[in-house]
A protein has these predicted regions:
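Conserved SGNH/GDSL esterase-like catalytic core that processes O-acyl groups on lipids
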Residues: 28-30, 151-251, 259, 285-292, ...
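Substrate-gating cap/lid alpha-helix
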Residues: 276-334
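N-terminal secretory targeting modules
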Residues: 1-161
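A structural motif corresponding to the C-terminal end of an alpha-helix
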Residues: 165-176, 265-277, 301-304
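Generic structural signal for well-ordered alpha-helices
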Residues: 262-266, 296
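Short loop/turn segments at strand-loop or loop-helix junctions that form parts
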Residues: 131-134, 140, 182, 233-238, ...
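Conserved small/polar residues in nucleotide/adenosyl-binding loops
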Residues: 340-342
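Structural recognition of the beta-strand scaffold that forms the well-ordered cores
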Residues: 129-130, 177-180, 229-234, 278-281, ...
Length: 342
């Protein structure tokens, strides 16, 4: 039994490209589609486009997590997720583990001939959006033996958005999540690590649904499709590349320019989301404190009850590598407590 992606019994969450409802494109980490069904088997047909790293999709089937490797070959491929299940009710959440190092087109699910698709569980009413970098995507999060250490060599196999502090926090608060984050990205173009050697910044990507020109046509995002209650800014760490001008001179013209752009970006999104609360932060990834001091300065300058600056207990000094699962759990605990009291 084929289940088309536009079947109303499927539940989606994330900034997803639905220009073709029968072939939606998952771009951002933590984007997912959920299906409730009866039957003994389930497969999914996907088309993967890869820019770098090996591509893996994640899933939660009846509460148990798994993953599978995607082919880099062009065209559609069908992947068996489960066989020989008990003939009872099942819930599958298929999610994007990684950022736009690849994009995935969903072409449908395949169930057994005697299966039934059930009404989806409703999404939570509370909504969160995170504009961040690789930490917010859960990059290299599964390399738990390297907690507090530099990253091991890898090809993307340790990256899992399920274990990002962002998705953990959303689950803690029973909230939807749009994890509008990208590994390596900085605020400004020509800085950071994303899209080497020209480097695209958040200012060029935040209002796009597809923004990776190596993989697809760049498309604008319709902000009316998702209105968050809480918006988290979690960037300012990749901005020190190719040179850490903020650490070198807090009062330089470049440093002041960054603060001005950060403020303009914040004030713009405050207009786009006029009722949202904004949390300005970075992470525990090692970086110079002048970036956080700059964010505090912007927060004080904007001087709005809707805007809060948040620092983790190990902010900027927790680890030289990416955040591993236990570190993300601690970050999520601290951030969740902060959001509960706002």
């Amino acid at each position: 039994m084929h289940i088309s992606p536009d079947d109303k019994r499927l539940q989606y969450c994330g900034r997803i490209d639905f220009d073709n409802p029968k072939a939606p494109v998952l771009v951002y980490a933590a984007s997912f589609v959920q299906i409730r069904f009866t039957g003994t088997q389930i497969s999914v047909t996907l088309e993967n486009k890869r820019a770098y790293w090996s591509s893996r999709m994640g899933y939660i089937l009846d509460g148990k997590q798994g993953q599978f490797l995607l082919t880099s070959d062009p065209g559609a491929e069908t992947y068996v997720i489960a066989r020989d299940l008990e003939h009872t009710e099942h819930t599958l959440t298929l999610f994007k583990r990684m950022d736009s190092c690849h994009i995935v087109t969903l072409l449908g699910f395949e169930l057994g001939s005697d299966a039934k698709v059930l009404t989806p569980a409703p999404l939570p009413s509370r909504k969160i959006e995170v504009f961040g970098d690789s930490v917010s995507c859960g990059e290299v999060s599964e390399a738990v033996d390297y907690a507090g250490k530099p990253d091991p060599e890898h090809d993307g196999e340790y990256s899992n958005s399920w274990y990002s502090y962002a998705w953990m926090t959303a689950r803690n608060l029973h909230a939807q999540l749009h994890d509008t984050s990208q590994g390596g990205i900085a605020l400004l173009d020509k800085t950071g690590w994303f899209m080497d050697p020209d480097y695209l910044g958040i200012e060029s990507c935040y209002d796009k649904i597809e923004y990776q020109p190596e993989l697809s046509e760049v498309k604008p995002w319709d902000f009316s499709r998702y209105t968050p209650d809480v918006v988290i800014f979690a960037f300012g760490q990749n901005d020190n590349h190719p040179d850490d001008y903020m650490a070198e001179d807090y009062n330089s013209a470049r440093s002041e320019n960054w603060r001005q752009h950060y403020r303009r970006f914040l004030e713009h999104l405050m207009e786009v989301y006029p009722k949202a609360t904004f949390i300005l932060t970075t992470t525990i990834l090692e970086h110079n404190e002048n970036w956080d001091i700059s964010i505090e300065e912007v927060c004080k300058t904007v001087n709005s009850p809707r805007v809060h600056h948040f620092l983790y207990s190990q902010n900027g000094k927790g680890t030289p590598g990416h955040i591993r699962i236990p570190e993300a759990e601690q970050m999520s605990k601290e951030l969740t407590l902060s959001l509960i009291h706002i």
